[in-house]
Amino acid sequence: MQMSYAIRCAFYQLLLAALMLVAMLQLLYLSLLSGLHGQEEQDQYFEFFPPSPRSVDQVKAQLRTALASGGVLDASGDYRVYRGLLKTTMDPNDVILATHASVDNLLHLSGLLERWEGPLSVSVFAATKEEAQLATVLAYALSSHCPDMRARVAMHLVCPSRYEAAVPDPREPGEFALLRSCQEVFDKLARVAQPGINYALGTNVSYPNNLLRNLAREGANYALVIDVDMVPSEGLWRGLREMLDQSNQWGGTALVVPAFEIRRARRMPMNKNELVQLYQVGEVRPFYYGLCTPCQAPTNYSRWVNLPEESLLRPAYVVPWQDPWEPFYVAGGKVPTFDERFRQYGFNRISQACELHVAGFDFEVLNEGFLVHKGFKEALKFHPQKEAENQHNKILYRQFKQELKAKYPNSPRRC
C-alpha cells in the first residue's frame, strides 16, 4: 500500500516535470520568435503551435453573427452591408488604415500588413453571389491561418441588395479548404484572382467606392483612407502615433501624406531616401501624374523631395486647398463622410476633400511619410465607360458644391 502510494507520487512528479518542460520549450520558442522578422517566420511558429480550436471557433462565431441577420441595406437600397466579418480593437489615439477592394484585389492585404503595424480596416465589394460566398470563405481562411488578420484587421462585406452571403463551411472541398498557412492562403488567392481593368466589374453593378470608404473608417478617431493597391512608407503608423500622443492639436487639421506611383512594383521604397532616388530617375512620379496632374499638384512635390531629412514625422508646410486637389490624409475630429452618391469613376474623393475645406479643415503636408501606388496610372488601364461615368459624376459634383453652401451657410470658404 505504502509502495503503491510512493509509485503514484513519483508518477505525478514525472508528469508535472514533463508538462513544465513542454511549457518551457514553448516559451523558449516564443522568445526566439520575437527576434525574428517577417511574416514567414511568424507562419513557421504557428505551424509548430497552431491556434487552439477555440480561437478558430471564435472566428467562425464572429462570421456567423455578422452574416446571420442578412445584413442591412444602405441608404440607397442598392447594396447589402455586412459589418464586422472580422473585428479589431484600437485605443482613442490610434490611426486605422482604411481601405476597400474587390474580392480579387484582397491579395494586396499581404503587403499592407507588412508595412502598416497598426489596425487595418478593409471593406470588400462582391459584385455577384459567387463573389460574396468567396469573400466569406476568404475571411475565414485568412483569419484562421494569419495571426495578423485575427489581431489587427476588421473586414466588412458589401454586395448588391438582391444577394445574401452565407456562413462558409470549411469542411467542404474547395479552393481554400486544404490550406495550412497564411502564405498558402495569399498564394492561392493570387492564383484564383482575375485581375482586371479598373472599375470593370463585368456586371451592371456600380462599384460603391464611397460607401466602402465610409464603412472602412467607421468608429475610428483617426483614419488614413487609401486604395488597396497603395503601400505606406515603413514606420508611418509609429510616426503618426507618436505625433498624436504628444499633442492633441490636430483636431481641425488634415495631415497630408504625399502620394506617388511607381513604374515597377517589384520592390517598393521603404523610406524617403529610397523614394527620392527612384523619383530622380523617373521610376517614381506623383500620383495620377499621367491622368490628372492638377489633382495632386498642390502637394508641391519638388518642395517635399528637397526637405532636409529628419528622424521624426511632423507637418512640414501648410497648403491652402484648391480645386481639384484630392490628397490622402489623416484627420481626427468631425471629419465629413464621403458622399455615397458618387460611384464608379470620377469626383468621389475630391468631393470629400472639397467639403473638408469648406468645413474649416486646414491641410499640412507631412515631412517624411508617403504612399506609393503599384504601377503608373494610365488611361488605357481603365474601362471604356470611364469618360461617361466621369461626366455623370462631374454634374453631380456641381450639384454637391451648391449643397455645401446650404450645409455650411456661415463658412467663407468655397470650392
Swiss-Prot record:
It holds the Pfam family Glyco_transf_49. Pathway: Protein modification; protein glycosylation. It is found in: Golgi apparatus membrane. Keywords: Congenital muscular dystrophy, Disease variant, Dystroglycanopathy, Glycoprotein, Glycosyltransferase, Golgi apparatus, Lissencephaly, Manganese, Membrane, Metal-binding, Signal-anchor, Transferase, Transmembrane, Transmembrane helix. Its main location: Golgi. Its EC number is 2.4.1.-. The keyword Glycosyltransferase applies. It is a single-pass type II membrane protein. Beta-1,4-glucuronyltransferase involved in O-mannosylation of alpha-dystroglycan (DAG1). Transfers a glucuronic acid (GlcA) residue onto a xylose (Xyl) acceptor to produce the glucuronyl-beta-1,4-xylose-beta disaccharide primer, which is further elongated by LARGE1, during synthesis of phosphorylated O-mannosyl glycan. Phosphorylated O-mannosyl glycan is a carbohydrate structure present in alpha-dystroglycan (DAG1), which is required for binding laminin G-like domain-containing extracellular proteins with high affinity. It is linked to Muscular dystrophy-dystroglycanopathy congenital with brain and eye anomalies A13: An autosomal recessive disorder characterized by congenital muscular dystrophy associated with cobblestone lissencephaly and other brain anomalies, eye malformations, profound intellectual disability, and death usually in the first years of life. Included diseases are the more severe Walker-Warburg syndrome and the slightly less severe muscle-eye-brain disease. Belongs to the glycosyltransferase 49 family. This is Beta-1,4-glucuronyltransferase 1. It comes from Homo sapiens (Human).
